[in-house]
Amino acid sequence: MNLKVRLAIMSFMQFAVWGAYLTCMGIYFSKVGLGSHIGSFFAVQGFVSLFMPALMGIVADRWIPAQRLYGFCHLMAGSFMLLVAWYGQTYGTQVDFSILFSLYAASVAFYMPSLALSYSVTYSIMTRAGIDIVKDFPRIRVFGTIGFIATMWLVDILNFEQNQNQFALSGFLSLVLFLYALTLPACPVNWSGEKKTLVDAFGLQAFSLFKQKKMTIFFVFAIFLGVCLHITNGFATTFIDHFQTMPQYADAFGVKYPVVLYSMSQMSETFCILLIPFFMRRYGIKNVMLIAMLAWVLRFLFLGLGNPGNGVWLLVLSMIVYGIAFDFFNISGSMFVDKSVDPQLRSSSQGLLMLMTNGFGATIGSLIAQAVVNAHTENGVVEWTTCWYIFAAYAFVVMVAFAVIFRPKREEVIL
């Protein structure tokens, strides 16, 4: 089978696993009486990302071939996610938060590092095969978005967003991906057997990137954009779902199929990914990130203004700009980091980026978003418009600060 096709299948499966529950699990938690804990479930993704991606990246760089470690992560993530589904099935609406949370946390502790490993495995295989990363990686990665959309739609059509079956589907797909990973080309560790310093021994060389001013600023703003990402992951579908309580929107398509409406965000991703090579080569990482930040401002603003009735076009616009907001940082940023480091640090540097976005960014974003939502909730009713305006103002401040502070030389950031 063609190598690019094999990597595209891996990308499809990687994000199909996540798409099965990421955008709709808030609906399930609300149904079982855990609505006030939604932020905690998203925050734990950030907490485990504070150390697991970097740790697994170090292991992949030094001791265990990345593709084998990648498969192991999915074996463990899938097993624990199936336990989440089993527990939900067994106890229904009587689930205990601490037990459900613990099982979920164990699963994402292994899934989150698989995200960074999927990139490093792909980059390693492409490099060894002489494939142009800037030209061909976006075409491979787009299948990840397609996989995410596919399981989102499947979950919505089967009404799994209301129950624990979304986790069962995710767990099953993880186990399939574990088996598939066993067939991937080898990604040999890059480390020599020579004597190393203590920093070398613990694989902390990736943190030396902070010695470069432009990389330090880049990683700090990666945290700020990670906050934006997990605000929308945690509450966008819950926001759309709340219109079910309003009679005037009862028959609206977005109310009947909130996950399908939300999946327009991922459809936008599939197109925007293909724009990355052009924008990165022509405009560089700073301008691409500024475009992403402006898109986050518009994303939150349109959500605050829209509704499933005569304002549905604003909701659709918010889904469209999400593709720009996500891809123009997450994908471009990953490629930028890969080009900025030594091949020996490929996995650990991707883990470091994951630490910033899905570690600190996710933890801070989830907790802040939950606090804002709770502060604007009265008698069980959330003042969503105010919440989205607050989030839009935050994204605007981040954008302005980045424009002023991040000043790399043009030749350093054109890939």
What kind of feature is each model-predicted range?
Residues 1, 185-220, 245-250:
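Juxtamembrane intracellular "pre-TM" segments in multi-pass secondary transporters
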Residues 1-50, 214-250, 257, 261, ...:
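Helix-loop boundary and gating motifs at the non-cytosolic
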Residues 40-61, 260-275:
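Central cavity-lining transmembrane alpha-helices of secondary-active solute carriers
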Residues 55, 83-89, 174-188, 359, ...:
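Multi-pass alpha-helical transporter architecture, strongest
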Residues 75-94, 294-308:
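C-terminal ends and interior cores of transmembrane alpha-helices
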Residues 96, 157-174, 371-395:
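A membrane-interface helix-boundary motif in multi-pass transporters
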Residues 105-143:
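Cytoplasmic helix-loop-helix junction between adjacent transmembrane helices
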Residues 286-333:
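C-terminal transmembrane helical hairpin of 12-TM major facilitator-type secondary transporters
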